[in-house]
């Protein structure tokens, strides 16, 4: 079968393209720019067109598209005019999974990628040989966001579209549900919650939910969190640099958890994985042992030393919701308690900025100095009356040193590095380009 992927370089799409290529399908596709993922695919013999064009056409049997691609895309138009089946990446993933293998899914607003990576790591260590579809990059996976295997499927189930509700995993973790993509549910919170309820009802064996999440805590077979009623409860947590140690209780029995990744949110992510694998019949002690060797996911608290002597560091992080930013700043304070924190934040999507209103300023006010760049639209239509300047204005009203910057490149070119300072580059767009430029300009050899 010949498969055309429209938006082939995206994290979610490239994992599907990798899977298809490695099982012997004829794969090609298009994207608007080159990336590490397109380079990997090319090395496997995948033809990739840069730019979307009516002539990007090799007579496919099926066309798969990312949610960022709309019906006016010329390749979609040509496919439909020729009677070629056009499906979303959700539909395509659903078809891949529908072959009788055991399925482990992770969904929710925050922490999906790290939790999925933890789950995949543990199943690999436990000898399950999983096939993994990840919504980020983890270096332990053969292709970063994809791992071929003969065992169960492990996948990140993106809740941004109502289509996720049709999936039927055997085991599922819901990290939380905050309505981060409510615009895709017509702003209807009840519809959003009903979609979570639907996928829970379709889950064949067990569902693990966060006991403190008001939208989904009651949907789980088992729960994790700080609540006394949690199946897996956090009793105590200590830390030493990037390492942390927790005492947890599962079904009345206490255990010790050690992680090499910082932040209470990662302890909770690990607890979700422990609870799910315990429900699937794995020994808790074996899961705890596997988690000791887990390393962080790319762009999740990625630390770079800029100038060790002057104690200047850079953190690159994908955080793009207010809750994720709060966790990031809290973790930074834990790991680097004496350093000043300077944040360069790129808001992601106009709809999110509009929906969250003043929540970004509230989340960012824990930083010492904040620079807000222009919104990364992520293929959304520009909303002229919405500007990221509103975040900077909100921070100034809190008495913070904050500034809106139209040109992030110019900002870092003129930065005078301050000693004993952490520079945090935060967002889900192309802020990584700015962080990489910053590191190249300022890092001491």
From Swiss-Prot:
Catalysed transformations (reactions): UDP-N-acetyl-alpha-D-muramate + L-alanine + ATP = UDP-N-acetyl-alpha-D-muramoyl-L-alanine + ADP + phosphate + H(+)
Pathway membership, UniProt: Cell wall biogenesis; peptidoglycan biosynthesis
GO biological process, alphabetically ordered: cell division; cell wall organization; peptidoglycan biosynthetic process; regulation of cell shape
Residues binding ATP: 108-114
Function noted in UniProt: Cell wall formation.
NCBIfam families: murC
Protein name: UDP-N-acetylmuramate--L-alanine ligase
Native source species: Pseudothermotoga lettingae (strain ATCC BAA-301 / DSM 14385 / NBRC 107922 / TMO)
